[in-house]
Structure formats: C-alpha cells, structure tokens
C-alpha cells in the first residue's frame, strides 16, 4: 500500500511524464523481465515484460518468419491455445506472402517438423489436458531441419521449472496472470535467445520502440 501511495502521489502525481526516467519506469519491463527470467531458465536481459500474451505471440512469430524468408509453414498442434492460432492466422493474412498455418495432432508434432517449416508454435502444456510437450526434443528436431521455435509458457511458467537455455529455445512468450500470480490485467512477456538479438527487430514497435523516446 505504501509503494502504491508513493507511486500515485509522488511518481505520477508530481513527476508526471518525467517519471519515465526519474522514477525508473522506462527500465521496469527489463527489470521485471529479469525476475521472470529466473523462473524460466533464461539469461538476464533477454526477457521483456509488457503488452498481452497475444501481442507477444505475434511479435515472436513475425520475427521468426523474417529470419526464415525462404520458408512458408508455421507448424502448430490442435491442442494449442486458440488465441495463439488466431494470432498466427492474422499474421499470415497481414503478410500475404503465401504462408500456411499447419495444425496437426499433438502427438504428431515431431514427425511433421520438416524442412518446409519456418517455425513451430507450441504451447508447452495443453490447457485442457495437462499434456506436456518435450521442449528439448522438439527444439532439437526443429533445429536439425533449420526451423525456429516459439514456445508459449502460459501454462508452465510458475507451475514448474522451465529451462529455455538448456533446451536451446529460440523464442518464448507467456503471461503473468496465471501461475506467476500477477492477477487480472498483468502483462505478458517475451524471450529472445541471445544468439538472435542482432537478427531480429520488434514487430508492432511504437513509441517505446525508439532508442530515445524523449529525444
């Protein structure tokens, strides 16, 4: 309660827009992201908190497809959370470049990871059945054929140990309102593997996508 009062009366009430720099708001997406990173096996500085999970799915997929310009297939499974599939379909329509969302049964994911696939979009834990995909094996299979991976951690982050670094995941997204106990309205997050940072650019970048928003 004391922190909230300070934020409302001092940081927002007095600093107003200068609070972005003077109160440290500008760095909170990364500083909070570092706390999430410890729970999902990610490197400090490579998880950013903000927006919604659906937006983060869009951003991760857009980056992955841009990194594989010669491939047109997004591979997912019928047990995936519906909004992930909706975002993939929306991105495909926006790109209008002949991409395909290929949806297979959960147990058939591995055998369908072929050289046609640009990126796999998989929710680690099925929200209906609790089925858990083997992140390490599926990521290795994807990399063996030159594909990238986007993992949705909505039903795993905070529920059990996740090891993005150990599994070699390329991208991961998640939310903080479920097993991270952020509550209603709390933001999503995105992870980009360090090896990809120099080869990706933010999709849907806005005011905070500028290197110096107040310049």
Q: Which residue stretches match the model-derived regions?
A:
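Pyridoxal 5′-phosphate
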Residues: 1-215
């Amino acid at each position: 309660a004391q922190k909230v009062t300070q934020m409302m009366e001092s940081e927002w009430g007095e600093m107003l827009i200068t609070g972005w720099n003077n109160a440290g708001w500008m760095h909170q997406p990364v500083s909070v992201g570092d706390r999430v990173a410890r729970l999902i096996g990610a490197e400090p500085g490579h998880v950013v908190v903000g927006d919604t999970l659906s937006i983060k799915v869009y951003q991760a997929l857009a980056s992955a497809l841009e990194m594989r310009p010669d491939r047109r297939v997004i591979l997912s499974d019928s047990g995936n959370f519906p909004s992930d599939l909706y975002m993939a379909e929306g991105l495909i329509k926006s790109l209008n470049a002949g991409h395909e969302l290929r949806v297979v049964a959960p147990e058939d994911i591995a055998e369908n990871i072929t050289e046609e696939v640009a990126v796999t979009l998989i929710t680690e834990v099925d929200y209906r059945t609790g089925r858990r995909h083997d992140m390490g094996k599926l990521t290795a299979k994807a990399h063996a054929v030159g594909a990238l991976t986007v993992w949705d951690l909505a039903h795993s982050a905070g529920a059990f140990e996740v090891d993005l670094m150990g599994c070699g995941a390329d991208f991961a997204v998640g939310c903080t309102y479920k097993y991270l106990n952020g509550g209603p309205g709390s933001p999503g997050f995105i992870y980009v593997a360090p090896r990809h940072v120099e080869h990706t650019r933010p999709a849907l970048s806005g005011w905070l996508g500028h290197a110096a928003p107040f310049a």
